C-alpha cells in the first residue's frame, strides 16, 4: 500500500529526524523566543548560543530585564555586536512590563521587530499559522514552487509569504518553520543544493524543471551615484 504524504508531512518528518539541538528550540515562552530571535538578527546560531544562555540566566523574564540598567544589559551583550538590539530589548521590556503581547500586530509594534520575527514568535510560542519568511524560506519556497521573480522585491516576498501562510494552515507551523530553517541549512543550500538528499524531490518544481541552480532570483537594486571626473592633460 502506498501512503501519500503531503509536503508539510514530509518536511515535518525530515525535521523530527534531522533537527538541530538548540537551547531556544521546543520552548513556548514568548519572551525567551523573542530574545533568541533578536540575537539571531545578523548573528550566526553558533555565535548566539553561549550569549543566549548567559543572558537568559541573568534576565529570565520581562520584569527582570525591565528592572535592569541598560549598562548591565550591555555588559551581558558584550561581544555579540550590534548593541542597538540590546537597547531595543531593554526599551521594549520597559514598555511591556510583565506581559508579552499575543497578537501579531502588537508584537510587530515592538522596537526592532519586523515581520519575520513577529511571525516566528506567533508560530513558535503560540502555534499560530504564520510562516516566518527569511532568506532560508525565500530560497526553499522559491525552488519548491519555481517562483521566477526577484526575491529582493517586496511584492515577491509578499507572494511567497502568502504561499507559506497557506502551507502551514492545519499543520504544526512551528515544526514547519523550524524545519525550513534546518532544511535550508543542510539540504537546500544557496549553491549546489543536495537535491539527491531532498525528501521533496517529487514536489519541487525547480528540481523537476532543472532550475534549482538558478533559483531563487535575487537581484538587488544598485544605487546610481553621480561621479565627478577631473580630466587632465599630461605634457611630456
Describe the role of every protein-language-model region.
Residues 216-236:
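Conserved N-terminal beta-strand and adjoining loop/helix that marks the start
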Residues 3-4, 8-194, 200-209:
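Catalytic cores of DNA base-excision repair glycosylases
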Amino acid at each position: 500500500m502506498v501512503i501519500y504524504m503531503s509536503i508539510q508531512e514530509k518536511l515535518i518528518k525530515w525535521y523530527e529526524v534531522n533537527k538541530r539541538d538548540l537551547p531556544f528550540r521546543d520552548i513556548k515562552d514568548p519572551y525567551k523566543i523573542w530574545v533568541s530571535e533578536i540575537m539571531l538578527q545578523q548573528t550566526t546560531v553558533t555565535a548566539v548560543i553561549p550569549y543566549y544562555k548567559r543572558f537568559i540566566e541573568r534576565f529570565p523574564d520581562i520584569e527582570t530585564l525591565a528592572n535592569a540598567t541598560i549598562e548591565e544589559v550591555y555588559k551581558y551583550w558584550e561581544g555579540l555586536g550590534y548593541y542597538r538590539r540590546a537597547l531595543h530589548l531593554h526599551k521594549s521590556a520597559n514598555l511591556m512590563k510583565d506581559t508579552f503581547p499575543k497578537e501579531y500586530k502588537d508584537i510587530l509594534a515592538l522596537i526592532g521587530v519586523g515581520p519575520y520575527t513577529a511571525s516566528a514568535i506567533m508560530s513558535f510560542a503560540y502555534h499560530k499559522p504564520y510562516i516566518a519568511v527569511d532568506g532560508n524560506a525565500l530560497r526553499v519556497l522559491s525552488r519548491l514552487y519555481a517562483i521566477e521573480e526577484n526575491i529582493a522585491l517586496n511584492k515577491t516576498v509578499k507572494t511567497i509569504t502568502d504561499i507559506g501562510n497557506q502551507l502551514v494552515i492545519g499543520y504544526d507551523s512551528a515544526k514547519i518553520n523550524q524545519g525550513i530553517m534546518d532544511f535550508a541549512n543542510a539540504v537546500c543550500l544557496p549553491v549546489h543544493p543536495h537535491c539527491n538528499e531532498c525528501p521533496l524531490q517529487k514536489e519541487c518544481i525547480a528540481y523537476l524543471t532543472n532550475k534549482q541552480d538558478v533559483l531563487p532570483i535575487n537581484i538587488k537594486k544598485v544605487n546610481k551615484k553621480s561621479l565627478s571626473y577631473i580630466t587632465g592633460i599630461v605634457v611630456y
